Regions:
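Adenosine-nucleotide cofactor-binding segment
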Residues: 1-79
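Short beta->alpha linker loops
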Residues: 8-12, 29, 75-76, 100, ...
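Short, glycine/polar-rich helix-capping loops at beta-to-alpha or helix-loop-helix junctions
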Residues: 9-19, 103-109, 130
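Terminal peptide-recognition signature
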Residues: 17, 72, 84, 119, ...
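Rossmann-fold dehydrogenase core element
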Residues: 26, 90-97, 107-146, 191
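C-terminal hydrophobic helical "lid"/dimerization subdomain
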Residues: 82, 127-192
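Conserved helix-to-beta-strand junction in the class I
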Residues: 86-88
């Protein structure tokens, strides 16, 4: 398995991430290297580069000096992509599956080709893989890290919690045509 390092933006998520088995946690708010890459060879780039190296040192504090990460699982996109491509180890890979902070990703291409790094897009799964993942869920072999479940008529409250960042760490779900949690199949959900 992997030795995961969680990157958080709120300290109250540290214990949650460590409880999931992370080897370590880094708070992104301790660094000022987020957003699109500044123009190379400018004072802004030099400042960005200093901060990225600080972030890399925080990784080394967890992995050991000189041990960069094999894979960066990149979700935010625009705001974090330049850093992800830098901290990934030589021959490593950045896997990107979304762009929640934006789709216009920038990076210093020199660190890609000189260190033979790879960028891989991922859209979760094809139909057969999605079916296999659903089977694992039904068999309760995966933990969805569920923090809260809302009945259908409370969807607006769930959205307000997310908007205000008041939701608990983990995933939230909504009951859709299910009377209660814990039901595993369509047949279980049928009221008899």
């Amino acid at each position: 398995g992997a030795n995961a390092i969680g990157v958080i933006s709120e300290e109250d998520k540290r214990d949650f991430v460590m409880g999931l088995g992370a080897k370590g946690v880094i708070n992104r708010k301790d660094f000022k290297c987020w957003g699109q890459l500044p123009t190379v060879n400018t004072p802004e780039y030099a400042e960005w580069f200093k901060e990225v190296r600080k972030f890399g040192k925080a990784i080394w504090d967890i992995t050991g000096k000189g041990n960069n990460v094999d894979i960066v699982f990149e979700h935010p996109g625009e705001a974090t992509f330049p850093v992800s491509t830098f901290v990934c180890k030589k021959g490593g890979m950045v896997v990107i599956c979304a762009g929640t902070t934006g789709f216009n990703c920038t990076f210093d291409v020199r660190y890609l080709w000189m260190h033979q790094k790879r960028i891989q897009g991922s859209h979760f799964a094809h139909l057969k893989q999605a079916s296999a993942a659903n089977k694992l869920m039904i068999e309760r072999r995966l933990d969805p890290c569920m923090s809260e479940v809302f009945p259908w008529d409370e969807i607006p409250q769930a959205h307000v919690k997310m908007l205000r960042n008041e939701h608990k760490p983990g995933n939230m779900a909504v009951l859709v045509q299910a009377p209660r949690t814990g039901l595993r199949t369509f047949e279980d959900a049928l009221e008899r």
